Each structure stands twice: as C-alpha cells, then as structure tokens.
Amino acid sequence: MAGEQTTTEYISHHLTNWTYGYLPGEGWKVAYTAEEASAMGFKAIHLDSMLWSIGLGIVFCAIFWMVARKVTSGVPGKLQAAVEMIIEFVDNNVRDSYSGTSKLIAPLALTIFVWIFLMNLMDLLPVDFVPGLAGQIGAMMGHDPHHVFFKIVPTTDPNITLGMSFSVFILILFYSIKEKGLGGFVGELTLHPFSAKNPIVQIILIPINFILEFVTLIAKPISLGLRLFGNMYAGELIFILIALMPFWIQWALSVPWAIFHILIITLQAFVFMMLTIVYMSLASSTEH
C-alpha cells in the first residue's frame, strides 16, 4: 500500500478511523475521505474503535469465563496459571493501594488492566495487515481501497481512552459523595486548600478554593485518558514510519521496537489501573 500512495496519504490513511456520522450538506453517511471524517466533528462514531474495543472486551470475558468453568485445584493448565497470576497481581495492587471497603474495586481494576492490555496488544500486528484485508474486502464490494479506513488499536483513539477515563471519573464522584456525603464533597471543593477562622475571609476564599480543586478534579480523567492515548498513538506512528522505509530496514527497526513496545503496552495498562485504584482510594477516604 505504501508504494501506491504518497507518504502523506499513507500516514493519513493509517491514522484515519472508519467513521460514520453527520456530514453537513450530505446527511448521515460513512466518511469517504479523512477530510469528511474530520468535518463530521462530534456528530460521528468511530466504527472500528467500537468494534475492536467491544470485541476484545468479549474476548476477555470469554477467556476468564472459560477458565472459571474448568478451574481445578490440582495442577493448573497454562491458561489457568496465567489467569491466576494476573488476578493475584491485580489483587495485591488493590490491597496495597486501596484503603476503602468496596468490593467493586478489584474486579474494576482487573477489567481495566486486561481490557486495556488487549487493546494495546493490537499495536503489535503488522501495520498493513488488517487495514490491507479491509481494503481488499472494500474493493470486492466496489469501493476504492484507498478510501477504506480501518484502525485496529482502540487506545490510539482519544474517544476510547477518554471515554474510559471519564467512566472512572463518574465512579470517583459517586464514591466521594457516598463516603463523605454531599456536604462533605462540596466542602472538599470549597474549603480546601485555603481556610481561615474569620468567616468573611473564608467566604472570600471559597471561589478560589473551588477553582483550584475543580481544576485538580477534572484534570484526573483528562490526564488519565490522554496519557494512554498519547503513548499508544506515538507507538503506532513509529510503526507506520518504519513501514515506509525499505524492506530490509523495516526488519532491522521493527523487531527491536516491537520488543520494546511490549513493555509500553503492559506499562500503560498498569499505569491506568494503578491511577484508577489510587483515585478511587482518595475518593473513599474521609481525610483530605
């Protein structure tokens, strides 16, 4: 594919999602070009990101369900041993970092870690393999393969990463209000970090405290989502740039980068999980 397109077209093609949305003047449709996808703005959905994220979520549930059905107290198989190792790893991190009493946190942390790891893992597939297959299928259906977009790494889509982080944010708000009460939650936003014994001075400090605490609060999901997106997007872009090089250079660069990228894939899933645990622990704590 790289040989049939200019460098700019090739990169743009690999970074454009399969998008369905509302295009001004044409109505609801699948974007035919990157420009159309961009023009759809917020009135659009990335079909490939949704397909892969939901599909990998189903794979995660299916694997763990299958292991749970066949679990044995004797010598475990390789798959059962791997699942037990992951569960124990997540459980230990929850015990070490979470000070609350909710039983939801461990399953939540496990889901986040494995799901994000599987989505990140898609970045190790050859850059042109799945998009190339999608292009061939599109060609058989009468479409120009250069206008068939199909990204396979959901975590390179900020809609996915921010969607997950803001879902965590909703849980943070829920547990903050549940554990501290509405008054305690509002008090955290308005009475800290600055306080005064003089009531008039304290009233003056309330809007200042609110601005500072609100920025701190809203920065949590934004930084959580953008950190994952930025690292995975950069990794994907490097793979794309390597694919543009001569064949013999591709192997020399892609193999070391893929090996190093395994660390990034695992680390980013771990960081997202740990920050979620820490944020949930802070939300459940009655101490500011």
Curated annotation (Swiss-Prot):
Gene Ontology CC, one term: plasma membrane
Main subcellular location: membrane
Cited function: Key component of the proton channel; it plays a direct role in the translocation of protons across the membrane.
Domain of life according to the entry: Bacteria
Membrane topology: Multi-pass membrane protein
Protein name: ATP synthase subunit a
GO molecular function, one term: proton-transporting ATP synthase activity, rotational mechanism
Classification via Pfam families: ATP-synt_A
Gene Ontology biological process: proton motive force-driven plasma membrane ATP synthesis
SUPFAM superfamilies: F1F0 ATP synthase subunit A
Recorded family membership: Belongs to the ATPase A chain family.
Keywords from the named record: ATP synthesis, Cell inner membrane, Cell membrane, CF(0), Hydrogen ion transport, Ion transport, Membrane, Transmembrane, Transmembrane helix, Transport
UniProt subcellular location: Cell inner membrane
Residues spanning the membrane: 47-67, 104-124, 157-177, 199-219, 237-257, 258-278
Subunit note: F-type ATPases have 2 components, CF(1) - the catalytic core - and CF(0) - the membrane proton channel. CF(1) has five subunits: alpha(3), beta(3), gamma(1), delta(1), epsilon(1). CF(0) has three main subunits: a(1), b(2) and c(9-12). The alpha and beta chains form an alternating ring which encloses part of the gamma chain. CF(1) is attached to CF(0) by a central stalk formed by the gamma and epsilon chains, while a peripheral stalk is formed by the delta and b chains.
InterPro entries to which the protein is assigned, alphabetical: ATP_syn_F0_a_bact/chloroplast, ATP_synth_F0_asu, ATP_synth_F0_asu_AS, F0_ATP_A_sf
